[in-house]
């Protein structure tokens, strides 16, 4: 049976850490689901981890719906949260339309959006419409052009206070959980203590209620990128390269396909089929 919002929130009540991973396709989602991951995020990180873009900005709602649907087909138990991509929730009307597509067409059980107090009318409206909303504070990738570069957020008194106020405002608006990205660990701990809803950290220290990692980072699929806050639990890039090289070599030396990979045919049938043909 699929996990629910209540299941995730009860994990905070019990003090049980929440593990969340990004997923973008049915096969990977099924593997993560079988491992017992309680919550999967179909992130707009799809853009720079799957689609070859340099950021999340080019990702469209059509992209998100398509990949969310794939993940929903692959994972039968995990709660599926889908990112609302750049500028799809600039107004109340746009937000409702985007959320409807992600849930009706994509099969998500919840959506995630970035931003603080300015987003509370959007969060409140979506919740009123029956859409569970996860917030996202700290470094918000959709604002990459505003930030200029990836950096830790909330290090000054004013910035830290603003993050705390934003977190409380999102909870008050009805968010069921909150991602804290690139936030100093002590500040993330203070926010976590003040909220009734779960906090999910990424580069926010060990004291959040849960953690989320981009799956390509966690699996070691990229040699060119290793964020400081990420830990590689596998190193799949060389394994995949070596497998591809072995396949190329096997084809080149005609050791693949072998007899066991091929289908047989009655020689008489083939001979009769070829009769009269040039």
UniProtKB/Swiss-Prot annotation:
InterPro entries: Pantoate_hydroxy_MeTrfase, Pyrv/PenolPyrv_kinase-like_dom, Pyrv_kinase-like_dom_sf. Pathway: Cofactor biosynthesis; (R)-pantothenate biosynthesis; (R)-pantoate from 3-methyl-2-oxobutanoate: step 1/2. This is 3-methyl-2-oxobutanoate hydroxymethyltransferase. The active site is at residue 181. The keyword DNA repair does not apply. Pfam families: Pantoate_transf. Its cofactor is Mg(2+). NCBIfam families: panB, PRK00311.1. Catalyzes the reversible reaction in which hydroxymethyl group from 5,10-methylenetetrahydrofolate is transferred onto alpha-ketoisovalerate to form ketopantoate. It catalyses: 3-methyl-2-oxobutanoate + (6R)-5,10-methylene-5,6,7,8-tetrahydrofolate + H2O = 2-dehydropantoate + (6S)-5,6,7,8-tetrahydrofolate. It comes from the Bacteria. HAMAP family: PanB (MF_00156).
């Amino acid at each position: 049976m699929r996990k629910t919002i209540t299941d995730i929130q009860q994990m905070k009540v019990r003090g049980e850490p929440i593990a969340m991973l990004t997923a973008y396709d049915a096969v990977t989602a099924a593997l993560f689901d079988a491992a017992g991951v309680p919550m999967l995020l179909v992130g707009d990180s799809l853009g720079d981890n799957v689609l070859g873009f340099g950021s999340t900005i080019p990702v469209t709602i059509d992209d998100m719906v398509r990949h969310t649907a794939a993940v929903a087909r692959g994972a039968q138990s995990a709660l599926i949260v889908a990112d609302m991509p750049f500028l799809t929730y600039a107004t109340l009307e746009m937000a409702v339309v985007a959320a409807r597509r992600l849930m009706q067409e994509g099969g998500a059980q919840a959506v995630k959006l970035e931003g603080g107090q300015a987003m509370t009318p959007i969060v409140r409206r979506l919740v009123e419409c029956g859409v569970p909303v996860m917030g996202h504070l700290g470094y918000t990738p959709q604002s990459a052009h505003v930030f200029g570069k990836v950096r830790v957020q909330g290090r000054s008194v004013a910035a830290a206070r603003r993050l705390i106020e934003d977190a409380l405002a999102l909870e008050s608006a009805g968010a069921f959980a909150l991602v804290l990205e690139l936030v100093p660990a002590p500040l993330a701990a203070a926010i976590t203590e003040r909220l009734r809803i779960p906090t999910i950290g990424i580069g926010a220290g060990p004291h959040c209620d849960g953690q989320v990692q981009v799956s390509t980072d966690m699996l070691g699929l990229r040699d060119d990128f290793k964020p400081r806050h990420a830990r590689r639990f596998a190193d799949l890039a060389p394994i995949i390269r070596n497998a591809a090289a072995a396949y190329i070599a096997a084809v080149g030396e005609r050791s693949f396909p072998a007899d066991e990979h091929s289908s047989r045919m009655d020689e008489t049938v083939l001979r009769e089929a070829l009769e009269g043909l040039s």
